[in-house]
Amino acid sequence: TNRPTEYNTLDDRYARVVTEELMPALAKDYNISKDPEMHGIGGSSSGAIAAFTVAWERPDHFRKVLSNVGSFVNLRGGHVYPEKVLAAEKKPIRVYLCDGRNDNRGLRDGKYDVNRDWFHQNVRLMKALTAKGYDVNYSWGMNNHGQKFGGAILPEMMRWLWRDGPVSTDPNDAVERGFRQPTAKPK
């Protein structure tokens, strides 16, 4: 694979692989809802921008995005997402961004490049999403480019993304709603 090209490019190629190849293959073995409100996608670093791009390109499949230390920088043009968000028609997606002030801060060859400042670009994207009226939440920590902070708040991020799910107060309700069971495989 070529991660910078496959994950960081702002086009629909990766989204097509996920929605046209991966999801149908998974649906053969698992009972996956057809409702895009039930579908979330997330990642860290280049995986986070890839996840955002999948939902951006295919909100008919994914409506929730979890981004940890997202690479919304100029690896393959990710730094232009704030402008794309502001210029485009609003899409029906919900986004949770997580990053830290000690993430990669844009030093390149000894000089500062704002387009390669991970934290700055995540904040810019959050501000653009907010200005456009998106359902967006964020957590900024002191972390560097890694999993520690995002892992610590993962339950909070997941609860926020899926906060509008059904809740039963019936004491006799024993229906498991926390996960989906695999479909029965034909014998």
Residue ranges and their predicted role:
Residues T1-K187:
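Non-catalytic cap/lid and distal C-terminal segments of serine-dependent acyl enzymes
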